[in-house]
Every structure is written in structure tokens, then in C-alpha cells.
UniProtKB/Swiss-Prot annotation:
The gene is leuD. InterPro entries: 3-IsopropMal_deHydase_ssu (IPR004431), Aconitase/3IPM_dehydase_swvl (IPR015928), AconitaseA/IPMdHydase_ssu_swvl (IPR000573), IPMI_Swivel (IPR033940), LeuD (IPR050075). SUPFAM superfamilies: LeuD/IlvD-like. Its EC number is 4.2.1.33. One of its GO terms (biological process) is L-leucine biosynthetic process. One of its GO terms (molecular function) is 3-isopropylmalate dehydratase activity. Catalyzes the isomerization between 2-isopropylmalate and 3-isopropylmalate, via the formation of 2-isopropylmaleate. This is 3-isopropylmalate dehydratase small subunit. The lineage of its organism: Bacteria, Pseudomonadati, Pseudomonadota, Gammaproteobacteria, Pseudomonadales. Heterodimer of LeuC and LeuD. It catalyses: (2R,3S)-3-isopropylmalate = (2S)-2-isopropylmalate.
């Protein structure tokens, strides 16, 4: 998993509350268990004018020019600004996969659905909770300033606006450690690989009848 330390990026404003996981990545694209291939279908029903299907050539599909991610000023955005209860609905890890592959490193909102919130950390995305007032002000500034960027410093737990104002956020210490060091569940397990090997050797020696090749 890619580590998250500090990031500066263009902000894309998704001014909708209660965005659910089926809107983030529609159900017809969930047939794959690979972590790649979902970026082109992020927010598929909003980005395109037709009905998306797996494995089609998205470059030939008609775009919804009114959708925020299709606006020229938000091309290359890596910070998503959203409203409350982002990521609600059914549990699907494909949602953070799609956001990550599109290029987003962080999502800022007043609140998140619990399962999506947890899945984001496990996949290298940083969900940041700010107050309604802070989020409202960010929406206003993004709208008024093309190319608006934020700098996110995970170690300092701070979001810095272009005008220099710093917005602080809270994060669980363990989740912070994992993101700073790029550790997903597998990475955490591999940190104890020596202890695991020692246990397996001891277990094999003490109960050899459990192993066919013993």
C-alpha cells in the first residue's frame, strides 16, 4: 500500500450528501476481485450519459459535461470534497479501490459511513472529517478559485488552505501509523513474519501428526 505522508492536490467538489457506494461504483462492475480497473467507472452513472457495462471502451462513451469530474478545471484532482454521510449503502471495498485508481488520495467531508471509512484507511485513502462550517467554506473557496489546492499533512493532522489557514483533523493513532508507513493488513502481518515462522516450526515439531510431510 502506498504511504500517505503529505499531499498537495487540486480539490474537486462533489456537492451531494449521502453518496452511497452504488453511486461511487455501480454494482455491475463488481464482478472482479482485482483491485484495478475500477477508476474509469468511478461515479459511472453521473460521469456518462449511457448505461455502463463491464469491459466496454469508456473512451467512446458520451460524457455528462455537467458532472464535476468532467469539468476542465477539475482534471487531475486528487482531493475530493464531499458532504455528510459519504460512502453509505452496501459494503464494497471496490468503492475505495475506484477512488484510489482515479487518483484521489483523500476525501474531506463532515461525516462518513463507518464501513467505507474503515475500508478507506485499509486501501491508502485518507478520509478527513471537518466541521460543517469548515466544509461549507471550502466549497465556497473551491467554486471561486479555479485550480484550488489543499495541502494535507498527515503527521501534523492538518489541512492547509491557499490563504494559509490551517484546519486540524483527528485520526486514530493506529490508522495514522499504518498510513504513514504504507501498511495494509498484509503488511502488518508481514512485520511479524519471523515470529510466525518460529511458531510454525514449534507447532510442527510438537504436533507432527498434523502435517502430511512430517
Amino acid at each position: 500500500m502506498k504511504a500517505f505522508t503529505q499531499h498537495t492536490g487540486i480539490v474537486a467538489p462533489l456537492d451531494r450528501a449521502n453518496v452511497d457506494t452504488d453511486q461511487i461504483i455501480p454494482k455491475q462492475f463488481l464482478k472482479s476481485i482485482k483491485r484495478t480497473g475500477f477508476g474509469p467507472n468511478l461515479f459511472d452513472e453521473w460521469r456518462y450519459l449511457d448505461v455502463g457495462q463491464p469491459y466496454q471502451d469508456n473512451s467512446k462513451r458520451p460524457l455528462n459535461e455537467e458532472f464535476v469530474l468532467n469539468h476542465a478545471r477539475y482534471q487531475g484532482a486528487s482531493v475530493l470534497l464531499a458532504r455528510e454521510n459519504f460512502g453509505c449503502g452496501s459494503s464494497r471495498e471496490h468503492a475505495p479501490w475506484a477512488l484510489d485508481e482515479y487518483g484521489f488520495r483523500s476525501i474531506i467531508a463532515p461525516s462518513f459511513a463507518d464501513i467505507f471509512f474503515n475500508n478507506s484507511f485499509k486501501n491508502g485513502l485518507l478520509p478527513i472529517i471537518l466541521s460543517d462550517e469548515e466544509v461549507d467554506e471550502l466549497f465556497k473557496q473551491v467554486e471561486a478559485n479555479p485550480g484550488y489546492q489543499l495541502t494535507i499533512d498527515l503527521q501534523a493532522q492538518a489541512v492547509t488552505r491557499p490563504d494559509g489557514k490551517v484546519l486540524h483533523f483527528e485520526i486514530d493513532a493506529f490508522r495514522k501509523h499504518c498510513l504513514l508507513n504504507g501498511l495494509d493488513d498484509i503488511g502488518l502481518t508481514l512485520q511479524d513474519s519471523d515470529a510466525i515462522k518460529a511458531f510454525e516450526a514449534k507447532h510442527r515439531a510438537s504436533q507432527p501428526w498434523l502435517f502430511r510431510d512430517a
